[in-house]
Design a protein with these regions (language model features):
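Long, low-complexity intrinsically disordered regions
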Residues: 1-106, 111-114, 119, 126-130, ...
Length: 179
């Protein structure tokens, strides 16, 4: 361990950012992380209130740091979305069909995919619900259901339970989405 100024190169800006600089950074970070998103989701990614993020998104659109994109929701509605300019190569690959999702993975209910309000429903027609806080009689999917992401689709969810004494993972329930 040592003092910051003795470790970091001289070209690193160590000044504390202003609140405006910090918030702009967080909105950009949210937009980069989400790929394509509703304008409000760029700030929602870091739990920023929309009243604070909206003018930042508008400024980033004017500066062409964020670019407008028109898309379709899962239900067919037209959506006015934004994409960070750093993500344009990925958008081109997706449009060309060369961006391929090849894996199946289990997601945490706390995954950033679900942070933005109703993003899962808008883009995938999937409603992620954390039911561990509900009484057992009101749960639909289980205590701690994990979404299943197969390639680029949320295809279902399952409720696992670890039997600690034996080290056995028990699948309490499995729900697959239609289609």
């Amino acid at each position: 361990y040592d003092l910051t100024e003795r470790i970091l190169p001289s070209w690193v800006d160590t000044r504390e950012p202003s609140l405006d600089e910090r918030d702009r950074h967080w909105v950009e970070r949210g937009a980069r992380a989400l790929g394509i998103c509703l304008p409000r989701h760029a700030g929602d990614y870091t739990w920023m209130k929309v009243t604070r993020s909206r003018p930042i998104v508008e400024a980033l659109l004017k500066e062409k740091v964020l670019l407008p994109v028109t898309g379709k929701a899962e239900n067919g509605d037209t959506l006015e979305l934004v994409i960070h300019r750093d993500n344009l190569p990925l958008l081109k690959q997706a449009a060309d069909g060369t961006l391929k999702a090849e894996r199946t993975t289990f997601l945490s209910p706390f995954d950033s995919l679900f942070w933005a309000l109703r993003r899962d429903e808008l883009f995938w027609g999937f409603h992620q619900a954390l039911e561990c806080y509900l009484p057992a009689s009101k749960r639909v999917y289980g205590y701690f259901s994990l979404p299943i992401l197969h390639k680029d689709c949320l295809v279902g969810r399952f409720d696992p339970k670890l039997e600690r004494k034996t080290g056995t993972l028990i699948l309490k329930s499995l729900f697959l989405e239609p289609g």
